[in-house]
Amino acid sequence: MTLSILVAHDLQRVIGFENQLPWHLPNDLKHVKKLSTGHTLVMGRKTFESIGKPLPNRRNVVLTSDTSFNVEGVDVIHSIEDIYQLPGHVFIFGGQTLFEEMIDKVDDMYITVIEGKFRGDTFFPPYTFEDWEVASSVEGKLDEKNTIPHTFLHLIRKK
């Protein structure tokens, strides 16, 4: 099993505001699709509700304490420990609480750094490059639909 974080955050580590992304960046959505298609996304219930439906062509797993939570096309787990039973490449997809629980346990992180400061009420936990090696850093292309500068980082935990 490979365990990764998949996240976009701004320069202040904002990841959301009122259960939505504070920015519109189609390049990041394509990046998520490219990385996670054919694999497993694990997210908290609020993150799932912000998306509104299972993402296609990948396994969608929702971690929730709500034992009555049931959505077609979604697998439900009720504890962090259940994540370790999932096969293949597993991406931790949010939100804040799940990231806080898992940042010290993942092998690597795929981070889209949004080069701006946005209003937010949910945040990605602090991390330092002392703990992570930059495997790749690619500037996102700007165009009429992608107007916010952004960088795609792949960080691997230092041994």
Curated annotation (Swiss-Prot):
Pfam families: DHFR_1. It catalyses: (6S)-5,6,7,8-tetrahydrofolate + NADP(+) = 7,8-dihydrofolate + NADPH + H(+). Substrate binds at residues 6-7, 28, 50, 58, 93. GO terms for cellular component: cytosol. Residues 2-157 form the DHFR domain. Its EC number is 1.5.1.3. It comes from the Bacteria. Keywords: NADP, One-carbon metabolism, Oxidoreductase. NADP(+) binds at residues 7-8, 15-20, 44-47, 63-66, 93-98, 101, 122. Pathway: Cofactor biosynthesis; tetrahydrofolate biosynthesis; 5,6,7,8-tetrahydrofolate from 7,8-dihydrofolate: step 1/1. There are two DhfR isozymes in S.aureus, this one is chromosomal and is sensitive to trimethoprim. PANTHER family: DIHYDROFOLATE REDUCTASE. Belongs to the dihydrofolate reductase family. This is Dihydrofolate reductase. The gene is folA.
